[in-house]
From Swiss-Prot:
Subunit structure: Interacts with the E1 ubiquitin-activating enzyme ptr3 and E3 ubiquitin-protein ligase pub2.
Name of the gene this protein is made from: ubc4
Known function: E2 ubiquitin-conjugating enzyme that catalyzes the covalent attachment of ubiquitin to other proteins. Mediates the selective degradation of short-lived and abnormal proteins. Mediates ubiquitination of pex5.
Provenance organism: Schizosaccharomyces pombe (strain 972 / ATCC 24843) (Fission yeast)
GO terms assigned for molecular function: ATP binding; ubiquitin conjugating enzyme activity; ubiquitin-protein transferase activity
Involved pathway(s): Protein modification; protein ubiquitination
Protein name: Ubiquitin-conjugating enzyme E2 4
Active-site residues, Swiss-Prot/TrEMBL: 85
Pfam families: UQ_con (PF00179)
GO biological process: positive regulation of mitotic metaphase/anaphase transition; protein polyubiquitination; SCF-dependent proteasomal ubiquitin-dependent protein catabolic process; SREBP signaling pathway; ubiquitin-dependent protein catabolic process
Reaction catalysed by this enzyme: S-ubiquitinyl-[E1 ubiquitin-activating enzyme]-L-cysteine + [E2 ubiquitin-conjugating enzyme]-L-cysteine = [E1 ubiquitin-activating enzyme]-L-cysteine + S-ubiquitinyl-[E2 ubiquitin-conjugating enzyme]-L-cysteine
Enzyme class, first EC level, given as a word: transferase
């Protein structure tokens, strides 16, 4: 079941890739993918190329994939291990969702962080109280780690 679904998503990604994202298997292991997200132009991550690791569980799509950033990023919802605080990767997962939709959701999280559900409270505090300092740090990290 999982393998059939993963193969279908891979074919769909090839036919209709989401803008500014790409994903595919690492070597021959269809349960382990690498994804790339281009930093959205209207965000402090513009110009950056961010790599993510995707691990599909054997009961996919009934359980969400494990997705994390392998590129460091300064963001209130993404910690230093690359873990992402995103509801659809946890309790709001649905088998109707696809990797394409997950990547688009992560892209929109880069444009619109959610400081009210932070994984890194310190960054969320800076985001809420000093937006220009947040954007400066995010741009610096992007330049340092993602370009």
């Amino acid at each position: 079941m999982a393998l059939k679904r993963i193969n279908r998503e891979l074919a769909d990604l090839g036919k209709d890739p989401p803008s500014s994202c790409s994903a595919g298997p690492v070597g021959d292991d269809l349960f382990h993918w690498q994804a790339t997200i281009m930093g959205p132009a209207d965000s402090p991550y513009a110009g950056g190329v961010f790599f993510l690791s995707i691990h599909f569980p054997t009961d996919y799509p009934f359980k969400p994939p494990k997705v994390n950033f392998t590129t460091r990023i300064y963001h209130p919802n993404i910690n230093s291990n690359g873990s992402i605080c995103l509801d659809i990767l946890r309790d709001q997962w649905s088998p109707a969702l696809t990797i394409s939709k997950v990547l688009l959701s992560i892209c929109s999280l880069l444009t619109d962080p959610n400081p009210d559900d932070p994984l890194v409270p310190e960054i969320a505090h800076v985001y809420k109280t000093d937006r220009s300092r947040y954007e400066l740090s995010a741009r610096e990290w992007t330049r340092k780690y993602a370009i």
